[in-house]
């Protein structure tokens, strides 16, 4: 299995500085739990947020499934606490839409003007982990 994730570093939101929660603690947790068997990069934001979501489940022998949108994939949003919208696309691995999704992802993954390496923003802060866990558990977050 090959998992690649591009995350917003949560350094800016709506013109205000942020402290990296939730994505930095989440990225650290994902790397730790996967024994670093996933690859993570950060979108290189400059005041804006990288909020788009593309999830591609690939299969050469079966139909590919893609979820596209901007809905946060969190307990709060999946649990109907926030009205979100995504698009579900099913297509063959060699179809034009799947090819375009690959091209877009590879462009931002491989070009350093779009993404930076995981080490740039990784945080192992116990306090940030605690704040993230607390706000997620109690539904006190905006994510």
Report residues per predicted region.
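PLD/PLD-like phosphodiesterase catalytic module centered on the HKD motif
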Residues: 1-143
């Amino acid at each position: 299995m090959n998992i690649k994730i591009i995350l917003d570093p949560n350094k800016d939101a709506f013109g205000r500085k942020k402290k990296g929660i939730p994505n930095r603690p989440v990225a650290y947790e994902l790397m730790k739990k996967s024994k670093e068997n996933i690859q993570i990069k950060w979108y290189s934001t400059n005041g804006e947020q990288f909020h788009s979501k593309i999830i591609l489940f690939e299969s050469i022998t079966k139909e590919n499934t893609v979820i596209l949108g901007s809905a946060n994939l969190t307990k709060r949003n999946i649990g109907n606490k926030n009205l979100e919208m995504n698009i579900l696309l099913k297509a063959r691995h060699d179809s034009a839409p799947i090819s375009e999704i690959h091209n877009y992802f590879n462009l931002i993954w491989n070009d350093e003007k779009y993404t930076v390496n995981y080490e740039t923003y990784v945080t192992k802060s116990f306090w940030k982990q605690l704040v993230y866990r607390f706000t997620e558990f109690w539904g006190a977050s905006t994510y």
